[in-house]
């Protein structure tokens, strides 16, 4: 079983941080989810003025077996095409990362296509897509543990590169 050492946030600064956010030159709560995110980042860093150091966005790609039931917006071919598109800077996520200075890591954990030779894609493939959960378990317990481990490893890698968010 995979365990993570994620400690509860120290809430002692919450009232002070919330007051600072509420008293910015804007209507209270007008930034919606962004205000919640700002509060969370301040609590993580335990400061009223957080800074992001080498922020990273991890994009994990995989195909889902239930797609075979035609319930997805797009066919599975779109997954590998989009993964390649992301390496060329053509996705919305690329624009976000460029705009805000985030490092983008594109990780293949289960795309039903061989992307191993594509520069810019980290190959950590567990399987060639998941099973159709309408008929069987989408993944085995072992595959699920492997997927969580890959996520943990990628976060560790980003942290070693100086990323704290």
Question: How would you describe each model-predicted region?
Answer:
Residues 1-165:
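N-terminal loops that bind phosphate or other acidic moieties
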């Amino acid at each position: 079983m995979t365990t993570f050492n994620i400690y509860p946030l120290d809430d002692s600064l919450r009232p002070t941080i919330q007051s600072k956010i509420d008293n910015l030159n804007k209507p209270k709560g007008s930034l919606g989810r962004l205000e919640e995110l700002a509060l969370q980042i301040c609590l993580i860093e335990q400061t009223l003025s957080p800074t992001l150091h080498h922020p990273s966005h991890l994009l994990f790609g995989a195909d889902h077996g239930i797609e075979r039931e035609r319930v997805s917006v797009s066919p599975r071919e779109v997954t590998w095409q989009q993964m390649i598109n992301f390496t060329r800077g053509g996705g919305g996520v690329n624009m976000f990362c460029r705009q805000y200075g985030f490092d983008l890591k594109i990780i293949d954990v289960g795309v039903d296509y061989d992307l191993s030779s594509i520069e810019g894609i980290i190959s950590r493939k567990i399987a060639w897509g998941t099973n159709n959960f309408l008929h069987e378990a989408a993944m085995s317990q072992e595959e699920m543990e492997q997927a969580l481990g890959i996520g943990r490893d990628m976060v560790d890698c980003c942290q070693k590169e100086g990323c704290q968010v």
